């Protein structure tokens, strides 16, 4: 296991994107680790470093990104996802609780008549839904472009109302955060959509050729495309203690997606298909974090205390041992193995 700085990780990711730029519109980075391993911190620092470099390039070069108008080349990301029958839409709008423990349920879609976007729904209903829009993204008003974005797994926590419909709702609430309490069906469907965008081939403006010289950031700025749909991803509202739809957006300006979560390498149910889905794109880097239990315990216990989930540090430790530690051991014992999964540390 090697210690990596945000600067070093950013160098690796940008080199990888440079190698893939002629064949892959975007690349994916999967960051996996148990509670307290620092995966969120690493992901945030990585994206901040990459975005800072890109915006510094724009400022110093005096250039602006070029968003190609390819409106006649719209990409149907949701092709192949079955549609809800009209009679089922009432159930969707009123909770959609009947499939909450069905790990084999295939997500379905419907068209939002208000804006024409497609909404993809799994076992968690609308709170865990994905929205896909074929609309050109707006340029940021402050010109703060984010070519790297985090896509967290947290938005696929089943809502508390959905946990109420488990066969054993008391146990479901007690073990919230364990694999069965996630909408893994729609999380996998999101990964399939994102992987599909990775395989889109970038196109250069008509006045450019592959022989033109330039930096990586020059080439990125020249190959943004309106034809790449925007994908709205649920997040988690800690104040409400429930998922929140559309909290994150992966749009045409996003060239690096950083997926972070506990179970993205878990060799169980729908989770086990996430890594192969991205592996098939030939455009993914996978980092796994693993620290000693003592370090994890102290980090998570302090986090529980600071967030109000525990009244004392001792209560935070107890909460860690009753839930987080069980999840951490499950990840360790049932983790997919592959030669290209790299172990890193942020001690």
From Swiss-Prot:
Keywords: ATP-binding, Kinase, Nucleotide-binding, Transferase. Its EC number is 2.7.1.-. ATP binds at residues 33-41. One of its GO terms (molecular function) is kinase activity. InterPro entries: P-loop_NTPase. Belongs to the YFH7 family. ATP-dependent kinase that could be involved in endoplasmic reticulum membrane assembly. This is ATP-dependent kinase YFH7. The lineage of its organism: Eukaryota, Fungi, Dikarya, Ascomycota, Saccharomycotina.
């Amino acid at each position: 296991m090697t210690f990596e700085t945000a600067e070093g990780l950013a160098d690796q990711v940008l080199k990888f994107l440079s190698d893939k730029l002629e064949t892959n519109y975007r690349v994916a980075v999967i960051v996996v680790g148990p509670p307290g391993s620092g995966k969120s911190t690493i992901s945030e620092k990585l994206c901040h470093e990459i975005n800072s470099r890109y915006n510094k390039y724009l400022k110093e070069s005096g250039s602006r990104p070029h968003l190609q108008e390819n409106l006649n080349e719209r990409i149907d990301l949701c092709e192949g996802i079955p549609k809800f029958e009209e009679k089922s839409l009432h159930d969707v709008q009123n909770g959609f609780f009947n499939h909450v423990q069905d790990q084999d349920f295939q997500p379905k879609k419907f068209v939002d008549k208000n804006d024409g976007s497609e909404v993809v729904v799994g076992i968690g209903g609308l709170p865990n839904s994905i929205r896909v829009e074929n609309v050109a993204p707006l340029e940021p008003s402050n010109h703060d472009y984010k070519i790297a974005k985090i896509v967290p797994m947290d938005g696929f926590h089943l809502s508390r109302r959905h946990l109420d419909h488990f066969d054993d709702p008391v146990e479901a609430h007690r073990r919230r955060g364990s694999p069965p309490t996630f909408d893994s069906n729609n999380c996998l469907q999101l990964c399939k959509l994102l992987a599909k965008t990775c395989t889109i081939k970038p196109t250069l403006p008509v006045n450019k050729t592959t022989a033109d010289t330039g930096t990586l950031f020059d080439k990125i700025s020249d190959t943004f495309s309106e034809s790449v749909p925007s994908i709205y991803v649920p997040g988690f509202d800690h104040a409400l203690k429930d998922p929140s739809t559309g909290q994150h957006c992966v749009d045409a300006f996003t060239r690096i997606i950083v997926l972070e979560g506990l179970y993205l390498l878990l060799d169980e149910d729908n989770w086990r298909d996430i890594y192969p889905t991205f592996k098939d794109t030939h455009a993914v880097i996978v980092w796994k974090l693993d620290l000693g239990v003592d370090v994890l315990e102290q980090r998570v216990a302090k986090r529980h205390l600071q967030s109000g989930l525990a009244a004392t540090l001792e209560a935070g430790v107890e909460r860690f041992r009753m839930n987080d530690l069980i999840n951490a051991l499950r990840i360790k014992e049932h983790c997919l193995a592959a030669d290209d999964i790299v172990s890193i540390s942020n001690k």
